[in-house]
Amino acid sequence: AGRVGFPVLVRPSYVLGGQNMRIVINDDELERQVLSIFKHLPDNRVLIDQFLERTKEAEIDAIYDGEDLHIMGIMEHIEPAGIHSGDSSAVLPTYSLSEQAIQTMCDHAHKIAQALNIRGLINIQFAIKEDQVYVIEANPRASRTTPFIAKAYQAPYLNIASRIMLGVNKLRDFDIVKKLDGYAIKIPVFSFEKFPGVDKRLGPEMKSTGEAIHFIKDLKDPYFRELDRNRSMYLYN
């Protein structure tokens, strides 16, 4: 933390749903968070990452066959980086990222899939600040956005990825056609009314219990305009 400077993101080295992840802003909070992690997860290790404030987040889902990479979709989050991806509304395809940032993300995705020797699905999350692209994490598996993208594009991605994982086919064996007229918005579903006393502020720990899909024809749609108008790049605003 002294090397990268506060705020920092403190988390267990392996975690699902952002459990026990916290953004801390000083030494006292850092000490409390580290002790809390070791108390609840004594066999884990602690990672301390620089936290980029007021930063956009986007993610790529892709299929890699050892030679070629197919970008299934790129989703841009409405909420800033620091909000768990499962709690953020997200738009497919992206709507405000520059072509330079998108190309950089795709280049990084190919290099990461190649370096990890992936066969099948991979999800990579990025933070984008002033067109500078940072890799948050790479998950060499199906993510919660995989079925969302398959549904939105009406493409049999799970079947394709399964056959590539088994070594039956290569990407070149498939004629993949994406069918989406407009945009698809991922909408998190919360059940706060069933959990009284839960902190409703969004952060790196996931709190949603599901998600829905909303299709729009263009960015003039009232639903999207309302989401975008209320967009804040600050946490806990």
What are these regions (language model features)?
Residues 4-7, 17-18, 24-237:
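ATP-dependent carboxylate activation and anion-phosphoryl transfer catalytic cores
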